[in-house]
Every structure is written in structure tokens, then in C-alpha cells.
Amino acid sequence: DREHTPFRDVTIEDLDWEALLDTRLVFVTGITAALTENTAAVVRHFVDQAHCRGITVALDVNYRSLLWGPERAREVLEPIARMSNIVFCSVRDGKAVFDIESDGEQACRELRELFGVPTVVSTDQINGVYLSDAERGERTFPVVQMPVVDRPGAGDSFVAGTLHGYLGGDVVQGIHYGQRTSAYALTHYGDLTRVSPSELNIPPNTDILR
């Protein structure tokens, strides 16, 4: 479904880098890098420039086997991960792309050690969310199962919520935000989730006020 997207033909010269780099955080995904050699070069250039300027970089590995193989994915994404401040990589993608055979918190820690980055967040479907952080150590966040109306967008919603807290200085709170945002995403059709900060701060299991 991405075969004919115009973005496949983008080049480094096409973009206004001064405008794009006027930001607190640069966020890139493996899906973007996987489309073509052009997009891989654009993503790498973006991260190189952000890293040189001291801008925070976040990478979501988001491996898709229909777009590229694990060897090529690792060749492109590992250098980007090493320049990142926070990396999102599921336990499944850690196994497929980076040969991490462990599970749970250990897998998350091994990814952080491999990349040499401050923070890695790993999801593992219903088994949990794992954090490995240079300052906070390792933590596991249980996943609450719920009825699913429509799944697309839940992963992106989790990352968005987590980055909201991370940019506020608290990645742990960010993961809680991410879980709530992801839960919202599962309750409606479509892959665009709109959640306000006030909704994210509603305590879990709060009763309805009448």
C-alpha cells in the first residue's frame, strides 16, 4: 500500500532542513527508512543533523518484513539507534532485527546496551511494556486487556503518549500516558486518536461523575 506514495522519491535536497530542525525532538521510524534507498538516506541525514545540533532523537524501529529484510533493516537502523536518545523496539523486532534472544526486561536492557543509548522502551503484546533507562533501571508495566474495536493506530498512539511524558521529563509517566492513549485508540475506528492532556491525567478506574 506504500508502493506508489510520492514520498518514496524524496531526496535530501527536497527538504527545508532548517525548518525541520527547529524543534525539540526529531522522531523517525523504520517504516520510513524501509521504503527506498532515498528515504533511508533522508532519515539518516535528518538524524545526523539533529545529533550534531544536540536535538533529542527518538526512533521507532517498527520493522516490517514486507518492506525489507532483517539484515538490511539492521544495517540502516542500528547506526540511527546509536545516535538516538530514546528507542522504541518491540521484543519481537529485537529478535528479528538485532538478534536479541532474551525476553522481558532483559531483552529491553540488552537492546539499550547494544545501542548505547539512555532509554529503550519495548512492547511485548499482552505480556507487558518494558523500560530500560540509564537512570531508572529496568521496569515492567503490565498490560490491561480490553475489547478491541479497531487495532490500527494503537502502536503509534502508544509511542505518542510516551513521548508526551518523556518531553515533560518523566518517561515513566509517559509510558502510562502511552498505555492510556493506546487504549483509547482501540476503542474507535480509524488510526487517528485525539486525546487531551486532561483526559490522559484522569486516574484509572475513575467512576463517572454525575
Predicted regions, residues:
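Conserved beta-alpha-beta core of the PfkB/ribokinase-like small-molecule kinase fold
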Residues: 25, 31-109, 118, 127-128
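Structural alpha-helical scaffold elements that stabilize or flank donor/cofactor-binding regions
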Residues: 18-19, 79-80, 113
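Conserved phosphate-binding/catalytic region of the ribokinase-like
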Residues: 48-49, 100-210
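Acidic, glycine-rich active-site loops and adjacent beta-strand->loop/helix elements
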Residues: 4, 63, 145
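Conserved phosphate-binding/catalytic loop of the ribokinase/pfkB sugar-kinase fold
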Residues: 1-40
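Short, solvent-exposed coil/turn linker segments
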Residues: 9-11, 69, 189-190, 197
